[in-house]
Amino acid sequence: MLVERLRRAGPKRLLSLDGGGIRGVVTLGYLERIEQLLGEKHGDPNFRLADYFDLIGGTSTGSIIASGLAIGLRAAEIKDRYFALGGKIFGQKKGFLNYLTKGYKYDSKPLEYALRDFFGDIALGDQERIRTGLCIFTKRAETFSTWALFNHPDGMFYSQNRDWPLWQIIMASAAAPTYFIPVFLEDNAGDRGAFIDGGISMVNNPSFRLFLLACLQSYPFHWVPGKDNLLLVSVGTGKSDQRTSNEVLKKKSLLGWAAAMPEYFMYDANQMNQMIMQLLSESPTARVIDSELGNLEKEKYLNFEALSYLRYDIQFSAKELGALGIELSKAKLEALGAMDNPDNMEILASIGAKAAESAVLADHFSDTFHVNQSTHKITLFETGKSYPLPFQFYVKREIPIEACEIGHPFYVMTMEGLMHAKAGDYLVRGIHGEYYACDREIFYKTYSAVERPGGGGSSAS
């Protein structure tokens, strides 16, 4: 049963897939390579990514791929369907008058028919045909809230959303403003909302939100963080090289600026997610964020690596594509960024395959996260709760430490993370020079002042 897999202890593996329209073909190039390497690693030529990843999440085009993988399709099968879908979905534009008056370029019916054919009557709550954890990100337009729709039965809103057909949720995730009309969904409680592309938010790259979904107590998964406990693989759709000159910007019209805004936003959202994920993780694929931050290799938040993290993506620049042996004109490079041009699919597929061959390495996937690795139990203990364990009484050995009362609130960065202390608490220095904080009352109950070894006054007061 799926629910047993979601509740099972042990290391967990997450897959996060960006939005990006037709550029999802690039994503599939990376996924084919990952699936091939993992199949070799597990000795199974028929290996599926649904067998490896315990939770797969996606936004917009990423939600189509995520759902296909979650029902057990191989990446190559999804790519074949993508090529069939692309021309139908983005083939026939609405007239310019329709675009001006109604605000969308494409008829959503071809997308609906294609997704219905793809996923049939599978609902979000189908615990048999959906083989792994699945999360689809969309945005509710009238409340401005980003929704994570997932299939864990213990979720707060699972009973209200479980009957929604996958094809309909995916349409909601992919209903990009100016491209398609919003999708209206009504849940089992009778609440009806208008939903648009999840990419119109910070979750166009959903990696950080997927990490929170896996670990926060507000959500039902409750997976334990740690670089040996969680692996998150994040895959992009490729990005345009947006660098330009002052002269070009001086000539940009109002419509030109308006057309560029989605790309600006998606770029910033992706950079922010990338920065947060590298700050939280151990990552062999860490990229330079900017010239000042570098790749954040030495900057770990609270001195704790909350997960292992892999990020695969490519910039459509002459430099990066040239390194792969792909030479394109400036006009063609600029055209690759379009999210709705099916004529780009062949070259995008080639870029994805070659980029993956170069970037995705077998040793990125540690044996710690091998599917057949013997499961080790990971327990999270929390202060304030009681546990039926055979506790025994112990007395601390007489190991001298140094301590100093601090008259104001303070923080201490320790190997375990950041400690918070209040005014009057003690800053303690241990025998190895390590610092930690000790509550004033606990300090008085635990320690007594002694002469400093070798004379010179007391070492604790």
Predicted segments, located by residue:
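Patatin-like phospholipase
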Residues: 11-14, 22-118, 156-159, 168
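C-terminal helical/tail subdomains of lipid-metabolizing enzymes
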Residues: 202, 223-225, 237, 262, ...
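Conserved small-residue
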Residues: 20, 62, 115, 136, ...
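Small-residue-rich anion-binding loops in enzyme active sites
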Residues: 1-18, 27, 144
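Active-site gating loop/helix substructures
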Residues: 91, 129-216
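Extended hydrophobic secondary-structure segments that form protein cores and membrane-embedded regions
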Residues: 14-17, 51-60, 133-139, 194-196, ...
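Hydrophobic, mid-to-C-terminal alpha-helical segments
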Residues: 204, 208-253
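A motif-centric signal for short, conserved binding hotspots located
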Residues: 381-432, 441, 449-454, 461
